Regions:
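Conserved N-terminal entry element of GNAT/NAT acetyltransferase domains
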Residues: 1-14, 153-154
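Hydrophobic pocket/interface hotspot
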Residues: 16, 49
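Conserved GNAT-fold acetyl-CoA-binding loop/helix
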Residues: 21-47
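Conserved beta-hairpin
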Residues: 56-69
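Conserved acetyl-CoA binding element of GNAT-fold acetyltransferases
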Residues: 74-86
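Conserved acetyl-CoA pyrophosphate-binding loop and the N-cap/start of the following alpha-helix
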Residues: 87, 91-99
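C-terminal "cap" of GNAT-fold acetyltransferases
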Residues: 109, 113-121, 126, 133-154
């Protein structure tokens, strides 16, 4: 098995978008209503993901030539970490997080992220602490629940 962590390139945009969308579409319905899943789509458009790649914010984990994990960062903020469902529970999420944290902790004393309900325990097990519970009104009497979490270097 060949595993490579690297900065995403513009050629990776479609696959990174697929990793995010496919994972969200498979996992989120077990935790969120259809309205919430559709609301999240606004923040995960192809254009946004492509822009983050062009700005050097996005990383990918490539296994045997296939992008299986993606994650982005801006300064000390980690965002959009997704592992294809068929690769979850095999350490690939931990691998990309290790690398993102290494980059961040080289320049910052802490890192932050917003954790979806399915990811909260994963981040807690990595040493993240919840600093705020968020209940975001998405309209029509619906809300989205997530955590803002922080990990301190050390």
């Amino acid at each position: 098995m060949k595993l490579q962590y690297r900065k995403a390139t513009s050629d990776d945009a479609e696959k990174a978008y697929y990793v995010v969308q496919h994972t969200k579409d498979v996992i989120y319905p077990d935790y969120y209503t259809r309205e919430v899943v559709e609301y999240v789509d606004r923040y995960y458009t192809f254009e946004i993901i492509k822009s983050d790649i062009e700005q050097g914010r996005t990383r990918v984990l490539v296994k045997d030539g296939e992008i299986i994990t993606t994650g982005s960062r801006v300064d000390n903020h980690i965002m959009r970490v997704y592992v294809l469902p068929e690769y979850q529970g095999q350490g690939f999420g931990s691998k990309i997080m290790d690398e993102l944290e290494k980059e961040i902790f080289a320049a910052f004393d802490d890192c932050e992220l917003e954790a979806s309900l399915p990811a909260c325990i994963f981040y807690e097990n990595r040493g993240y602490k919840t600093v705020k519970h968020v209940k975001e009104d998405i309209g029509n009497g619906k809300c989205m629940i997530y955590e803002i979490m922080r990990k301190v270097k050390g």
